[in-house]
């Protein structure tokens, strides 16, 4: 992911 929006993006 880009920011902290995903669990393990």
Swiss-Prot record:
Keywords: Amidation, Disulfide bond, Hormone, Secreted
Role description: Antidiuretic hormone.
Entry's Gene Ontology molecular function annotations: neurohypophyseal hormone activity
Disulphide bridges: 1-6
Annotated positions of the Glycine amide modification: 9
Chief location bin: secreted
Subcellular location: Secreted
InterPro entries: Neurohypophysial_hormone_CS
This protein's GO CC annotations: extracellular region
Protein name: Isotocin
Species annotation: Cyprinus carpio
Family: Belongs to the vasopressin/oxytocin family.
